[in-house]
């Protein structure tokens, strides 16, 4: 039986990995390639249009075999099947986890509590498509009869990061008849700058909040409504300029939005897994229903690859297991996501929520403390080549071991071919430099003065993977996002954490609700926080002005 819920470090599969590490750790990547020149052609895997080269990871084929054995021992195949079947694998909230149903084809059956959810998914997609076509064609007009020119998505977390990332990633495919802006921060600057130069009569707001009570989103939505009504006057204008992505019809109606323009989703879709649900309405308006269907097809193709491919050739499983190897055995606590494509400039930020909110847990799914190992690596990054002139110094010569995921495309979406060759040359060069470095002898052979030799030496042996695709398309983006979704799931199974809850965000919300009343109190409030927080509140109240 799989040893899924016992302490990870006590499992025979983990101990086998530790013994293997003792043999492998003394070997530099230079030595691994010297012993096995063909590893660059063998330590690769392909799926859903993506090519993964992990030969510059500090692993061998035996490492991958042992990692796959660990996944088997922790019950990954069984947990994966349970998720696809619609079982309640989000144990702390008692919910199914079925983002895979959002991209299931018509006719497939996926049951939640005995009910097939696929027809519901496609009913929403069909309504989204009809609405998107209306906005794109100009058939949907504002209250004064003007055509919509700007779409503003108002959300936070998964209701913002996914749509904002997808729009920036797919700008090459987006209609040029519409502009798109995204508001998430409760900081009024975000909304003020988003609407600064807009004509209210030509602006459509998409308000994304499942409950329609999310503090940040509804604060921004209320201010946006005030901005609109200050210009258009008539409260009936709200129904032509606001659309809801929500399941709370009563609150939607109270806000002034026609429930006919409410697009729902389900409690089996977590926010950070929702960009291909109704939360993606802004994406569909931008790239059109056909482009959105291509996005879903890419998700689906990777879903099927994750479900069916052997673990040792399974891209999401490999990404997830290599992450466990790097974090828990090699000590690389952070992952730099380095897309060599400017269109993916928000992809690292998107992955921050997907990975860190999912697996940043200190207790197991059953509530026991995680024993003796970390969970949830820290994800960060910037597009190449910007990062090379920022933080790559630390990657190459710093004291922290950082695992890197390079992402690149063989064909650009522009006609500046030499630019792309230079870009990709840098991608390949960085992976090579991180892996092999430069020895003191090589530095001296180049004529480096002896006092500078230590400064011109690169240790190498820094692990990285490279993900290549032919071109960035909606389909490729869907596959890329699903790759990391399922990698996160894989890691959650290994660590035995619930990757689909986020209780850690709750305490700050509760305290903020208490503090805002103290900030807004006309009389001096009786503060009962710690001394630091009390002093900060008093200083703010004294200095904020009128």
Swiss-Prot record:
Its EC number is 5.3.1.9. The active site is at 357 (proton donor), 389, 509. SUPFAM superfamilies: SIS domain. GO terms for molecular function: carbohydrate derivative binding; glucose-6-phosphate isomerase activity; monosaccharide binding. Pathway: Carbohydrate biosynthesis; gluconeogenesis; Carbohydrate degradation; glycolysis; D-glyceraldehyde 3-phosphate and glycerone phosphate from D-glucose: step 2/4. It catalyses: alpha-D-glucose 6-phosphate = beta-D-fructose 6-phosphate. InterPro entries: G6P_Isomerase, G6P_Isomerase_C, Phosphoglucose_isomerase_CS, SIS_dom_sf, SIS_PGI_1, SIS_PGI_2. It comes from the Bacteria. Keywords: Cytoplasm, Gluconeogenesis, Glycolysis, Isomerase. PANTHER family: GLUCOSE-6-PHOSPHATE ISOMERASE. Belongs to the GPI family. Catalyzes the reversible isomerization of glucose-6-phosphate to fructose-6-phosphate. This is Glucose-6-phosphate isomerase. It comes from Anaeromyxobacter sp. (strain K).
